[in-house]
């Protein structure tokens, strides 16, 4: 798994269940001081974990997520929850016009439909549930604002 380099800013994880921090430089401030009150789940759709982490953490790719949940259940944090990760693109939902500013983005390592769409391992699902529960408690996210898309 790629490691953070000395020139990358490091931060303290927002959750005690985070096993590693690999900082992404692809983030910004939340618009108008907006607080995150939504969780958006994605799967990576890439053939391997190294490629997915490189895509999310390499400066200039203009994509990131707050968390990555690995197949073995480990959780990597790439962007502090207080910041705006770039995982939702130009998107709209239930009157929200800037999903990146109101959400915590979680990428779930899975090759997706282009590579046979394997089942999500039970360890990965358990870790994802624990992570989401913690975020929901910390940020007071109601269950109807936990969303997923491919």
Predicted features by range, described:
Residues 145-150:
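Short, intrinsically disordered, charge-balanced linker/junction segments flanking boundaries
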Residues 2-142:
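Active-site-adjacent loop/helix surface patches within enzyme catalytic domains
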């Amino acid at each position: 798994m790629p490691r953070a380099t000395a020139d990358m800013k490091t931060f303290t994880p927002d959750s005690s269940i985070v096993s590693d921090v690999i900082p992404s430089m692809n983030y910004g401030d939340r618009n108008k001081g907006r607080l995150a009150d939504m969780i958006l789940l994605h799967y990576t759709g890439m053939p391997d974990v190294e490629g997915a982490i490189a895509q999310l953490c390499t400066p200039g790719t203009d994509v990131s997520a707050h968390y990555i949940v690995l197949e073995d259940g480990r959780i990597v944090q790439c962007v502090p929850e207080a910041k705006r990760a770039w995982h939702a693109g130009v998107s709209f939902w239930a009157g929200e016009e800037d999903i990146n500013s109101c959400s915590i983005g979680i990428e779930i390592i899975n090759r997706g439909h282009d590579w046979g769409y394997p089942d999500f391992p039970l360890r990965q699902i358990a870790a994802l549930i624990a992570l989401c529960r913690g975020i929901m408690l910390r940020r007071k996210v109601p269950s109807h604002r936990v969303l997923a898309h491919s």
